């Protein structure tokens, strides 16, 4: 059972600061044993577009992540063990909350039920093509969580207390393009929203 990574490479205007942050994560991720490392650099991707691409890998573990996220070998090993031992793999989905990374001595769990930068599937799922959900926009994770939990009836967990991936965004709010000068959100993904509460790997049944 292979593990694949799907991510974008996007910023609304040319921004060398964001590009450097994305590059930092890319250099980390490319050293890992991903079977496929798929990067959409044509536009801001949607969950729909990634899930369509993931249909090429129906027997693999497929990770959708933002470009400022990176992983390590322990994450991949723990993830592989989880799916190997889970009976109904197609029903298991993970929506993970980030660990903010500045350096090896400064890593903090964001500990939020309403924020997931990473979603993981065995194979893929079908979303309504009439509703395109963009990555990296406020509420995109909560909207996707609602569809997965309420419409598709998947078993969705957030074991980010144990399963740690890292978010590298030291530039913070200064490069968030959905904020105005007062640091207020100027957009949000509409529709029903759900939160995914934090848990440990041992809580997944």
Where are these regions (language model features)?
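Conserved catalytic core of nucleotide-sugar-dependent glycosyltransferases
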Residues: 55, 69-150
């Amino acid at each position: 059972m292979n593990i694949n990574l799907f991510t974008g490479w996007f910023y609304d205007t040319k921004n060398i600061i964001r590009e450097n942050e994305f590059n930092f994560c890319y250099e980390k991720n490319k050293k890992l044993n991903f079977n496929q490392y798929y990067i959409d650099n044509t536009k801001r991707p949607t969950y729909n577009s990634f899930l369509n691409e993931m249909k090429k890998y129906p027997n693999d573990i497929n990770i959708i992540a933002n470009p400022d996220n990176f992983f390590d070998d322990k994450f991949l090993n723990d993830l592989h063990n989880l799916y190997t031992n889970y009976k109904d793999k197609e029903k298991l989905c993970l929506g993970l909350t980030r660990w903010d990374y500045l350096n090896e001595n400064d890593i903090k769990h964001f500990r939020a039920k309403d924020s997931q930068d990473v979603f993981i599937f065995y194979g893929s799922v079908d979303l309504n093509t009439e509703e395109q959900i963009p990555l990296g926009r406020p509420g995109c994770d909560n909207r996707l969580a609602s569809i997965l939990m309420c419409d598709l009836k998947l078993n969705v967990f957030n074991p980010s207390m144990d399963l740690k991936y890292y978010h590298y965004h030291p530039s913070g709010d200064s490069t968030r393009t959905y904020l105005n000068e007062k640091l207020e959100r100027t957009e949000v993904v509409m529709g029903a929203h759900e939160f995914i509460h934090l848990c440990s790997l041992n809580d997944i049944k």
